[in-house]
UniProtKB/Swiss-Prot annotation:
Dihydroxyacetone phosphate binds at G181, G209, A210, S211, N230, V231, A232, T233. Its EC number is 4.1.2.40. It comes from Escherichia coli O157:H7. This is D-tagatose-1,6-bisphosphate aldolase subunit GatY. Forms a complex with GatZ. Its cofactor is Zn(2+). Pathway: Carbohydrate metabolism; D-tagatose 6-phosphate degradation; D-glyceraldehyde 3-phosphate and glycerone phosphate from D-tagatose 6-phosphate: step 2/2. It is an enzyme of class 4 (lyase).
Amino acid sequence: MYVVSTKQMLNNAQRGGYAVPAFNIHNLETMQVVVETAANLHAPVIIAGTPGTFTHAGTENLLALVSAMAKHYHHPLAIHLDHHTKFDDIAQKVRSGVRSVMIDASHLPFAQNISRVKEVVDFCHRFDVSVEAELGQLGGQEDDVQVNEADAFYTNPAQAREFAEATGIDSLAVAIGTAHGMYASAPALDFSRLENIRQWVNLPLVLHGASGLSTKDIQQTIKLGICKINVATELKNAFSQALKNYLTEHPEATDPRDYLQSAKSAMRDVVSKVIADCGCEGRA
C-alpha cells in the first residue's frame, strides 16, 4: 500500500527529530516534480491540495495520479486535504480514498471550532484517516480564504491542550507568526510560544505559511516540535516565473513538453531545498 495516511509519517518525524514537507500541487507537472524529487532523495512527502486544487484537477484524477506514481517509484505518498472547511466535501473525498485531512475551522469561536473539528475527527477515524486542525489564525490568503493581518491571532498554549484533548485530532497546526504567501520582510516567529505549546501538547505540530522562511527559522521550529512544514506559494512563484522567462526568451515555443521543463526545474530546486531544510532526506 503506497498511498498512506500522514499519521505514521508525522509520528516517525516526531520521534526522529525532523519534519515532513507538505507540498501544494496543482496539476500533473507539479506533482511530477514533487514525487520524482522525493523518490530520488528517499524523502517522505505529503501531496497537499486546497479545495480549489481538487476542483481544478478532479478528486478522482488526483487520487489516480498519486496512486500510480507511488507504485511506479515504490515510494509511499500521502495525499492531503489542505484547508478544507465543509464536512460534506471532506466526507465525499474520504470516501473516494483520501486518507489525510485538514479541517480548518480556525475562524470560528473556540467552542465552535472544537465542535466542527470533532465531527470531522469522529467520521474520519472510522476510515483510518488522519486529521489535522488549526488553532489560531494565519494572515494572508489561501485559496478563497483571506485573513487580514490585523485579524490574525496566535495559538494559546493552554487552549491548545484543551483543543487537542476535546477533538481527538492527530496533528495540530499552530499560529506563531507565519502567514500565507511570501514575506515582504523576514517574519518574527514566536519561538517561545512554540516551545510552550510543545510543553502543553504532545501531538505532532504543523507549521503553515513556510514559503520564504529561512533555513535557520525552519530548523529552529523543528527543534521545538514542528513535524510538518507546509509550502505552497514558493513553489508557484518558482514555477510561474521560470515559465514566464522561458516564453519571453522563446516566443516561438508552442510545445508544453518543452517549455514546461524550465518551470519544473525551478520548482525542483525549491522542493530539494525544503526537503534538506526539513532534514527528511533518506527517511522514507
